[in-house]
Amino acid sequence: MSLRQHQHPLIQRLADRIEAIWQAFFPLAPYALPEDLGYVEGKLEGERLTIENHCYQAPPFRKLHLELARVGESLDILHCVMFPEPRYDLPMFGCDLVGGRGQISAAIVDLSPVTGQLPAAYTCALNALPKLTFRQPRELPPWGHIFSPFCIFIRPQGEAEEQQFLDRIGEYLTLHCQLSQQAVPTDHPQAVIAGQRQYCQQQQQNDKTRRVLEKAFGVPWAERYMTTVLFDVPPV
């Protein structure tokens, strides 16, 4: 049984939605993670910590990563990032849900540019979406300059806002899958590689994620997981 069956209902629904959209657009092939990092169990302050990774590849993406994690009965996490092949100047799709004790405390989604600004087709499509208002927006972390103006970071209030957020992720993801299939190779792959490296290096600064992993598995393991599973930088 997948870990998601035990997680917050919104995380279950989002995981299913992401995989359904991927399957609708791409011929998914497995992406090989280190054998010991695909499914991981540990202890965090006496509670069981479980991490389950789902990883695929499909042109023009070198890696499609969906991570589910659970700490005891108190914390549920969904983390998703799509890593384009560096020869395409495509944004980084990323979303995260963090919940515990029946509530979602943090929800974020973005299409983050890697070469300064989003491609014009993305800006046009995202501007065409109906504007949404959420009652509790959250402040981006200090390294949040990597995100686009279309980033949504909130604490959803009630089921209606949870559904709105889920649907908006579906819209962002569908747009991304559609537009990515029209991408042509860039003349400046080194700029894309540099942008993806910057994105990954900034995300690796996420202290909350790092602290949880270090407490459960130790500093060397956490560093390896952060840099090989969560945010591996593309080769030069």
Swiss-Prot record:
Keywords: Oxidoreductase. One of its GO terms (molecular function) is cobalt ion binding. The keyword Phosphoprotein does not apply. InterPro entries: Ferredoxin-dep_bilin_Rdtase, Ferredoxin_bilin_OxRdtase. GO terms for biological process: phytochromobilin biosynthetic process. It catalyses: (2R,3Z)-phycocyanobilin + 4 oxidized [2Fe-2S]-[ferredoxin] = biliverdin IXalpha + 4 reduced [2Fe-2S]-[ferredoxin] + 4 H(+). Its EC number is 1.3.7.5. PANTHER family: PHYTOCHROMOBILIN:FERREDOXIN OXIDOREDUCTASE, CHLOROPLASTIC. Catalyzes the four-electron reduction of biliverdin IX-alpha (2-electron reduction at both the A and D rings); the reaction proceeds via an isolatable 2-electron intermediate, 181,182-dihydrobiliverdin. Belongs to the HY2 family. This is Phycocyanobilin:ferredoxin oxidoreductase.
